[in-house]
Amino acid sequence: MATPSPLPSFAAIVVAAGKGLRAGQPVPKQFATWRGKPVLRHSVESLRAAGADPIVVAIPDHAGDVAAKALDGITEVVFVTGGQTRQDSVRAALERLSSVPPERVLIHDAARAILPTPVIERVLHGLDESGGAIPVLPVVDSLAVAAGERMADKADRESLRRVQTPQGFRFSDILAAHRAWTGATDAGDDAQVLMAHGGDIALVEGDEALKKLTFAEDFMADLLPVRVGTGFDVHKLEAGEELWLGGIRLEHDKGLAGHSDADVALHAIVDALLGAIGKGDIGDHFPPSDPQWKGAASSAFIEHAAKLVDEAGYRVGNIDLTIICEAPRIGPHRDAMGQRIAELLATSPDAISVKATTTEKLGFTGRGEGIAAQAAATVVRKDTPA
């Protein structure tokens, strides 16, 4: 069995300066979390493990802090501010490397998060006899040449390939090509720039895993279809307090005491929703030490939790709430509570179950000293049919 030849030394450029708006993430997609860590970190770790040194990352203006956080702990990484176009960003990174020029450089799109080591190896070895090497895959679908909304001609897919990154180059060749580029529009990729400069490009086998993360659906596909969280809360009953429970006010001789309106039912639901998406608990988001939440309506807390669920790529599946008390009687108010909770979560009342029980006169709830509530919540990936 032949022993693979060692990889030659190389530098790498990771292009991460785009806005990434189509991905529908709260931050540019290269900094969004995917499979447990920022998209950018995936490919940088792969390049670093393969021996890339240094790695120059082109980032948006004023994104230094978020980029540094995304790559915390990874050594030999240099940041440069990207330009208006991808080509401008690559040029800036190449110029940064030019002071100590490497012999070979790989240029990779950060949005291609999964970067298999065999692809890196094939691209680098493809430079043994060419000024450039790019990973490609065959075209599997039939193709048509369009003229407006009509088919004008067929296209021969046998001679076409899908192009991926990382694209590898002899550094001096690609730097000279970028400096000489006079195209009227931005180049489609760096191989196009080198070809315009008379360079030779080798084609090597790509990998389907190098899919580019582009749309919101690409991020959702990585999410679990359903996640579950639970919550529990207790508040003391005191005279002179209003009793808010399940988002509605009840008439009773005592009310629940707390920093906010002390609605244990909504608090339990908030904790269940936050737990389902791994966002801590109600105290993390609304600390009782913060005076702005003094006497606050718990409806604000549950709406905040629902917003975080949405931002995480999920929608509320269902809520199962149990209120534990001797008094007041919950039965007459269950439907109103369910309706109000559904309104706050922008979901159907059918998705909300409100139940009540007692502890048979045992414990603090049995003695009428307080009310407890527990909740279970499911959140469902937003692209799942309702």
From Swiss-Prot:
Q: Which family does it belong to?
A: In the N-terminal section; belongs to the IspD/TarI cytidylyltransferase family. IspD subfamily.
InterPro entries, per this entry?
IspD (IPR001228), IspD/F (IPR026596), IspD/TarI (IPR034683), ISPD_synthase_CS (IPR018294), MECDP_synthase (IPR003526), MECDP_synthase_CS (IPR020555), MECDP_synthase_sf (IPR036571), Nucleotide-diphossugar_trans (IPR029044)
UniProt: a divalent metal cation binding residues? 233, 235, 267
Task: Copy the pathway line from the protein's UniProt record.
Answer: Isoprenoid biosynthesis; isopentenyl diphosphate biosynthesis via DXP pathway; isopentenyl diphosphate from 1-deoxy-D-xylulose 5-phosphate: step 2/6; Isoprenoid biosynthesis; isopentenyl diphosphate biosynthesis via DXP pathway; isopentenyl diphosphate from 1-deoxy-D-xylulose 5-phosphate: step 4/6
**Which amino acids does the record list as binding 4-CDP-2-C-methyl-D-erythritol 2-phosphate?**
233-235, 259-260, 281-283, 357-360, 364, 367
Q: Which PANTHER family match?
A: 2-C-METHYL-D-ERYTHRITOL 2,4-CYCLODIPHOSPHATE SYNTHASE, CHLOROPLASTIC
GO MF, one example: 2-C-methyl-D-erythritol 4-phosphate cytidylyltransferase activity
Protein name in UniProt: Bifunctional enzyme IspD/IspF
